[in-house]
Structures are given as structure tokens and as C-alpha cells.
């Protein structure tokens, strides 16, 4: 019976994608024209031709579509708009680290609100983590539950990760070949979700052995293994010491001291050793926070170890010194660290050690932050849920930092779009403006600033560590596969045309 559910699930996905394309009249030629298009590492004037949701032509800015002698639609033309000479057109953002929390914890977030927030932020693709939903995505059966929960809710395209926990390595093959997951994630310490326990070295080896078999037997592309890289012992020792010292749990420094860099450093060292021995399965460090780990990652990469790392919007913008007393909206794991640490992370981004920037969007309810909705309550950092909501704000957060540092705007495309799409194997269709790729774009004004108003965000729980902050880079329009899904001023994302993304070459059709 289960195999028929598998066949039906894959058939439904393909049929749904076909119907969505037909419904949106994608066969009609569409044109985007702009003076400032990020293309091949440059900002140049271009005309972009779109059909069936794909970019089919890249022409000079002066190109006249009337010469093609067919009906066409102008999606965007900066010559027909006022005061937009500075607007940038870029490939839609890809956020490969998002916690959507559906099914089971939709009071935290959900596919409707998360994908709406993504669209409003210029993000056209997100990848959902496997642990904060209930059930967690650690089996093929649970994966089908998540797929079912997505139907009729997606405003942007969504890929899924599976989870690796002790004893579930035999689920890997089915989740990849029949479920189409883009990769897997594990924790080296308790995740905070009882159903998603940490793995040890034997568990990792078992999982890697399964992935080796997949790669060798089916001649398939690499399936990434992602790790939350902290070990527990240094954290437990630091927490006991701080409690014995009666350290104030409402002071952010107390939480920061409870999560020392050595916890990350030791975990990453262990993962480098395992990956070096394995050499076939690629591993990826999610949300790198400790600057002390940068050098060992760089050395391993230079030695040919298949390992990579990401960092987050939060670690590149926020600092521990600026966290207000008791404001647990700033709590994440690993933690936001000192200004000096932030600068070293930026150095690693600029020199290419860290190749992508993501949100690690991890929302929850206000009570789990040990706060109330009066905006005046004081929270306990040691008890509050760790996670910062930033999915909608990534483009302006990182552009504000780049603008202040004199970093070219073209780097946004590499760090926020192309890098994440490569990580999860979607760069054949996502991540940049190229002929044959999905016609996903964000149009924004890099010179316009705004003040973050948390109540106007599309998130389900409308509170933010960025509330009241001035950021540069206002998103004016988001386009998904040639369809405009968001325009500045929209208070609801009405088009539900998002699709589940799979590695089509990994689906076993035999």
C-alpha cells in the first residue's frame, strides 16, 4: 500500500506543476527591462525574455519585443516607471535554512505565513528544516505528512530536508529516491525537540555509508549532510558555573558565556575529521557563529576536504554588546557574539571561506520567548526559546552592511542567491539570471531606507529583534517563474503558485 502512496505523491507533484504552469498562461512571452540588472557579476542594462516560467533570452536594453511578431506582456520596464533609475533587478533570493514548523507547530509559523514573508522579502525559494514540525521529518512516512501539509499554501517554491537521528539511516534511501529531499540535517547536541535527538560518530558514519551507496549505485549527484555544530559538554560546564555564580539570566552576557566558542570549535573539528576520512559525502556547517573556527574550516577546504559553511544575517549584523537587558528576541543558538567576532565573520565571507548567507529563520510564540505582548516585559535568556525571525529582512540587512562597508552590490547575488542554490543542488534552475533557469527576480531600491515595523511583517508572530531599526534596500516587486507575486504595499500574498522542489534526477522512476 505504501508504494502506491509514493507513486501517487510523485504523480501529484508533477501534475500540480503542470496545472500551475497552464493556469498562469506561462506560454505567453513576457519581458523585463531594466538599466541595473545583476548579471554575470556586473550591473548592466538588459532585457530579459521569459516563457513557461523560464528565462529564454537575454537581450540588450534597447531590444524591441515587437520585432518578434507575437503577443507579449511587459512584466517590468523601468522606462515606464517614475523615480526608479536606481532600482536593481537581481535573481530571486534562495534561503536554504528556514524553520517553517508545519505540520504540528503552526502556532509558531506555517507554510502560508512563511512563504508570504519570503515573497515580501524578495525570496523566491526556501528550504525547510526537518526538526521543528511535528512529526519531525526523520522518516519517509513523516515526509509524506509534511508534503500533504504544504498543499494549497505555497507562495514561493519550497524544498525539504530530511533529518538524521540515531537509528534512522535506513530511511535515507527512500527519502532521497522516492521523496526527493534536497539533503539531511543533524545535531551534535540536544536540539530542543525531544523527537529529534543528537547523533554520535557512529550514527554519522552509518548515514554516510548509506549516502555513499546511493552515490555509487545510482550515479547520482551529491546529497549534502548539514550539521548544527556544537557539542554539549562545554555548554553544560559553563551553565553550571554561571548558576553557581548567581549570574543574572536576564543579562545577555550570561547567555553568551553559557554558549562558549569552544563548543562550536570542538564540534567542527570532529566533523572535519569525519569528513576527511569519508571524502565522498559533503558536509556543511550551518549557522557558523564562532570566528575561532574559520581557520580550521579554511585549512580543511584547502586540503580538499568536502566541507563548507554558512553564516546568518543575524551574526553579520547584530552584536552581543547591543542586546537590551532581558530582550530574548535576540536569543539564538549558537548566539549572536561580539562586534569583533562579527568583523571576523565578514572577513571570512569576503575571502570566500564562507560562501553563503541565510536566515536560520526560527520563529516561535511570544510566551516561548518568556515575554508578553506589552513590549515591556523582561525575559530569561537561559529559559527562552532560541531563534530569531529574519526571513523577510535578509536582503536589506545584508545590503545595509555591504553599503556601509563599500562592498559591491553584485555580491548580494552570490551570497544570498547563487551560494544557497548550489548548496542544495538547485543551481540548475535557481540562484541567478541565466537562460534556462527559472524566471525568479527581486526588484529593489538599494538607496531607499525604511524603519522596521514588526507589526507590518508577514510573519505569523509579529515580533522582531530588528523592530525600529533603519535598513536600506526596499523590495518593490518579487517575481516567481515569470509571475509577479508581491508588490510594495501589498498586505497579502494572493497568488498561491509555489511548488515543492525536488532533485528530479534523484527520484527513482523504475
From Swiss-Prot:
Top enzyme class: hydrolase
Cofactor(s) for this UniProt protein: Zn(2+)
Catalysed reaction equations from the record: (S)-allantoin + H2O = allantoate + H(+)
Any Gene Ontology CC annotation: cytoplasm
Positions contributing to Zn(2+) 2 binding: 185, 228, 287
The keyword Hydrolase appears for this protein: yes
Any one GO MF annotation of this record: cobalt ion binding
Binding site for Zn(2+) 1: 97, 99, 185, 360
SUPFAM superfamilies referenced in this protein's UniProt entry, alphabetically: Composite domain of metallo-dependent hydrolases, Metallo-dependent hydrolases
PROSITE patterns given in the database record: DIHYDROOROTASE_1
Post-translational modification comment from the UniProt entry: Carboxylation allows a single lysine to coordinate two zinc ions.
Subunit composition and interactions: Homotetramer.
Family membership noted in the UniProt record: Belongs to the metallo-dependent hydrolases superfamily. Allantoinase family.
PANTHER family assigned to the protein according to its UniProt record, in alphabetical order: ALLANTOINASE
Protein name, as recorded: Probable allantoinase 2
The gene coding this protein: allB2
